[in-house]
Amino acid sequence: MLNPGYADEVKEWHKSHPDQEAHFFWDKKTAPPVFRVNDRLTFHRINDVKFLEYMQGCSGYVTTAGFESVCEAMYLGKPVMMIPTHVEQEINAADAVGAGAGIESTTFDVSRLVEYIPSHNADSGVFRAWVQSAEELFIRHLTTLV
């Protein structure tokens, strides 16, 4: 998920890496549903179904470290590069890095993610087990409060 303000940074990175196919989802309301910069760089307006389809097929995921999308990437075993923009995202990124989701960065230098991908441990089994136990954990925590 991309703040439209970062689009120029992504485009600049892509000029140096024109062979790298990249799809970004952004919340730019005035943009068309699909904005193709060239054959290898495309921006998509937010669409939850399309986002998950692309997430499932991607090699890696770049985000500002929003909780939900990082969890979706972890569930699918996708390596993540997180560029947090405020304190909540900084906390999410630190937690996700600690959980093995990927790496943290201060810029949209996607090359860092591309270099990281071969070393990423894509075993999402532990995370999936934790997700599956959520209902039980939630009920247990609620009942201990009563």
PLM region spans:
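Short, acidic/turn-prone active-site loops that include or flank metal/cofactor-
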Residues: D27-T30, N47-V49, T85-Q89, F108-V110
